[in-house]
Amino acid sequence: VYWRDRKEWYVQVLIFEMRLLTFPGILTGSPIEIKPNFNPMIGPSPYVLINMGARFVPCMHSVDGVQNRDTGGPISWPCPDTTSNDNQNCTLAQLCGFNMPEKQNPVFPGNKTEPLNEFENQPNQWFRFIVPIFLHAGLIHIGFNMLLQMTLGKEMEIAIGPIRYFLVYFSAGIFGFVLGGNFAATGIASTGASGALFGVIALNLLDLFYTWGDRTSPWKDFGFILLDINLFYHPTNKLE
């Protein structure tokens, strides 16, 4: 009944994804990365995603080996519109986009003795903790996200209401990227709603444990949640 009565959801998703794929098409001539590598998620290149707002630590704050680099020459950053391995002649500001000031580009040679958090004119695109929730590496990526959203997410939103669901969803999504921005590899772009959806999974687990004795088949429900985690995590664990 839910699926039959809510036909508009897939139209909204389709329009949203078509809008997201328009920008990569303008930059590289194709909405899907096919050169120099093929994106198995059927989506744009990581450089396009960085330019669109993916979590990319060098765009957000000073990074060891970037701002304090004093050997090996200045870093040549890939250009957002690159379709080859040779187009590595952009500045960090050009890669990051969003009108990042040129004065925030790393200066070579950097100062090895100055603490990273005290560098002047360091990048500060803090909104990259939020924007990546709405970006995805490709159609397969958003497909797995929507699968979980329309199963466990739907049931939890009905149970707790849209306002509480909204608060949990975005809190988990934002702080997931905060943790990734502090502890994940600094040179990898990250996108997607995995952090938000793992918050939804946590709510489902809490609900299961609180109502364990009232359920007809609690172990079956628990197994279903574990299956969702396994199916959802492995295809996207390198993206988010």
Give the residues covered by each predicted segment.
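C-terminal transmembrane module of eukaryotic multi-pass membrane proteins
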Residues: 219-220, 236-240
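Hydrophobic alpha-helical transmembrane segments
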Residues: 5-9, 143, 166-170, 225-226
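Transmembrane helix-loop-helix
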Residues: 131-204, 211
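Structural signal for membrane-spanning alpha-helices in multi-pass inner-membrane proteins
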Residues: 16-19, 23, 180, 232-236
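N-terminal signal-anchor transmembrane helix
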Residues: 1-133, 218
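Alpha-helical membrane-protein architecture signal
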Residues: 123-131, 171, 175, 223-230
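Alpha-helical transmembrane bundle and helix-membrane interface signal
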Residues: 162, 206-223
